[in-house]
Regions:
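Glycine-rich phosphate-binding loops of nucleotide-dependent enzymes
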Residues: 1-250
Length: 250
């Protein structure tokens, strides 16, 4: 993915003139201090806030300000606001996990009357939900349980499952471990790394936790003042990242 001159109008975030190249198949981290723009980048690209500039993926221009067109281009997003954006709290795990893929890709639907009518494939929906309940160790009473009734960590796992079910080629994940316990954090990070390795999916992980980024990312970009201050290998010393975070970007 190539990002050029990206700006985003998101309250509490500064994003102006972001230029960034993401390598196919890598896990790229984006870090930085609060309000400096790291959260605005994925929210702007995925159409949740007004944005401008140029974003290309696999040689195709990605239309900004259109969440549906981003999904059609095989992009997916796990938002930092899991209760406000990520989940249908009063719906079942099955509906949360399967609905986006049904709506965008017509997955988990059975055709009738030569395709004139499509109806939910309940067996397939249950199967995909159970697959992710098992793989992500989602603690629940079953696939029919409502998302509202789960703990924060398990809600986050459902958000991941929803994105995984889309089988994207490129995945943005914003603050994936925020507000969840230590054990659940590691499972979420392991799931992201496994998804990347087994499916060749490019992952961009945005996080306030530098050490979490360093644990699974190949490279880490630091955002300061709404721009990319620098990109370093994840193995570089923490002090180098700290210097970028407080740097004045010209």
């Amino acid at each position: 993915m190539s990002i050029r001159k990206l700006w985003v109008d998101m309250p509490g975030e500064i994003v102006r003139n972001v230029n960034l190249d993401v390598r196919e198949g890598e896990i790229l981290g984006i870090g930085g201090l609060a309000g400096q723009g790291k959260l605005g980048i994925p929210n702007g690209i995925m159409g949740l806030y007004e944005a401008g500039g140029s974003v290309t993926f696999k040689g195709q221009e990605i239309p900004l300000n259109s969440p549906r067109k981003c999904l059609d281009a095989d992009l997916a997003f796990v938002s930092e606001d899991r209760r406000g954006v990520g989940l249908l709290l009063d719906e079942t795990l099955e509906w949360n996990i399967a609905f986006p893929a049904m709506q965008v890709q017509s997955k988990f639907l059975k055709p009738y009357l030569g395709g004139l009518i499509k109806w939910r494939d309940e067996k397939a929906i249950h199967a995909i939900t159970q697959k992710y309940i098992d793989e992500l160790a989602i603690k629940c009473t079953g696939s029919k349980q409502k998302a509202r009734e789960l703990s924060g960590g398990n809600q986050q796992k459902v958000c991941l499952a929803k994105a995984f079910a889309l089988e994207p080629k490129f995945l943005f994940v914003s603050e994936p471990t925020r507000g969840i316990d230590v054990g659940a954090k590691q499972l979420v990070l392991d799931a992201l790394k496994q998804f990347n390795q087994e499916n060749g999916v490019t992952v961009v992980m945005i996080s306030s936790e530098l050490e979490e980024l360093r644990s699974i990312c190949d490279r880490i970009a630091i955002v300061s003042g709404g721009r990319i201050a620098g990109i370093l290998p994840a193995s570089d010393p923490s002090e180098d990242f700290g210097m970028l975070m407080v740097s004045s970007v010209k």
